[in-house]
């Protein structure tokens, strides 16, 4: 019997913590970029970007800084224009949620999220709990680019550090929903170049702005004269060795302390084709009041002593789509049409779009790929597909492939399509072509993607099908691109779109993640 994802989490919380353990980087090999990290009492919170995926701004929680569990999203829907609904032939690829910030304000027991959307202004979402419900509370006209929120521990004043190269600090109104004042606090010298990705802190009476030089450096600004400076600067790291073979330099992210008073830096590493993944290292504070990173052989360590007793959380297992809502680990490609899906002992996907282009097919549901290698297996009941429908699973990015079922009249075919590509402006350049097919006459199919997202070129996603859930046949493979410009890494995705008329449906009965996940043909 396979445990559900939720059951696995329950098992994890029952494991007895062990003192003196070590952890290995990355702490979670999943695409969770532009992170903000903070602690409330004995729980750590992690907020990330996810661009055009919905719901947006995923939130994770942890008791030990190493094992993380998805708990929700700060932005329930991308309500920033019709293109986020794929309306009128438009899309919002590589737009939406960039680096943003989240904090808890104890004085009014409210959680806050701030993010600038397409440079048009900063949206503010609030909630009574980290898990929600989150609602939009305000829009501030100023774009707080790469915002970092500080709630001053001494007087409860809210500040936001933001900007690119020209770094600013804004003081917010008492309710945090508008701006009281703002000023530039630091102009980056040409000798450093670009600084962005602000996070703002206060420690021992000094104010700090933690900024990145993308994508190979991290700097710290410090002021003992107040939040508006003046600030002095010090390099924390530059061109540092990565704990992931062939991975980028750890950078951006944020600082966090434990209840014991120890400090840590959670950065992310460019790790394509899988995306940008989190990595953790200890921090000490020097006599000059600046933080210093604990290195191993002059590089970011592959492993360190655990910050706290570890309580493992599993990211493998089976989701049976029980209940009436999707778990927070799932995100749609753009906003879904909520009238075209339902969750009740399975996920029913009604066709929501008439198209021949997966990149324009609404209600495509995605799941991050667990690295360095894993497989994702979807079980589909296809008995209610209609003529012209296409249902299947994809390795989804700006260069994609999929395996699925084609329903044409009374004929049902298993097929693999490859060569789905986008232009540099993220418009579809090719809808792909069929590279393999097989006759099929059943009503249930198992579709599996095995993905190797170790960093580098030539990494493969392999596509399999089964008619009984036991013997799997390989239909083809995709060489995944490892360019960074799309930002988001490859994801598993399940879809059902029409090429003729709406009305058909499929039921996704379950989804299983296995790691390392290598499949042999049966």
Indicate where each model-derived feature is located:
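Carbohydrate-active catalytic/glycan-binding domains of CAZyme proteins
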Residues: 18-522
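Fungal secretory targeting signals
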Residues: 1-21
